[in-house]
Amino acid sequence: MNNVNGVIVGIDIQDKITQAAIWDEQTEMVIHVTGPENEAAFLNPFEVPGWGQSCNIEAACEFIASIIECASKCAQGRKAGLICITIADYEIKKLNFISEVMKRLQFNSEQWSVISHEESFAFYAYSQKKGLYSAGVMLLDYSNDDAILSLL
């Protein structure tokens, strides 16, 4: 992470909302990114199935650009150097769509990545002390409608 030119931005695209945070290397803290009106989450311009439909590409570009702009404001004007996007549906159509969005926003492929929610959770869980996960790790993903249990 020492070679990152700018702040590290995490963008979590969920069904109806998106949340974002930055990693501040100076304070070694995660800072939650708020929206233009200081809201805690960004309302998606379309639901998750829309990520991948070419008719939504311009709206997606504007949406991601606004999140990156808000992240820069939270970082006292420092620009995004590395962006990690997490998504629930890890499908090639959506990955290509996000790739096109990032290309249009003039981020090269070394400046961003996409991982699934499960990968993000596993990375977090397994980066903890081994004693915390040696007996196994359980991922509980829940919404208002249901809960999904996965053992890692």
Predicted regions and their residues:
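A generic structural signal for beta-strand entry/edge sites
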Residues: 17, 39-42, 146
